[in-house]
Amino acid sequence: STATKHLNEHGTLIRYPMADSIVHKVLAHNEEKLSSMVSSRKPFGLATNVAPFEEGDLTLRYNKGTGKYLRSMVNIGVELIDKWKVMISYLSAEHAGQPDKNGMFRVLSTTEILPPESICTETYLIAGAFDTEAEAINYYNYLRTRFVRFLLSLIAVSQHITRASFDFVPVQ
């Protein structure tokens, strides 16, 4: 059997007919998408090679772990500093989009909750910022569901996870 497909329908090619059907159902609800919550690159204006300070009033999450950083040195994303944040890696998981030995796809290589007074370098994105820890935990758990990982895998076709990678994922 053959099927007709409009290749420009979603802004990205969806390879699997079943996935196309699911995306149609999700988009038909016209709900807000997670892309409206995810930060752009460099959520705090800090490059990957930024190193922590000896002393500071903030905790910096960077590619080698955590360290101290001065609030006075942060000019971008200031409104996020005192919120609970869900942080994800800017790079997608390994295996070039292939399933692991258990047949599971790891789309997000790092997903962590950052407490208030924490920031990160451009190695990471802020997937969402919240007033309470409970909201951050709920969102963190949502990002780890098969539903979200599946929708992300359809559009995250490069090694980078971006705000646009969340264009199919509805806010819950």
Regions found by a protein language model. Give the residues of each.
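C-terminal substrate-recognition regions of SAM-dependent nucleic acid methyltransferases
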Residues: S1-Q172
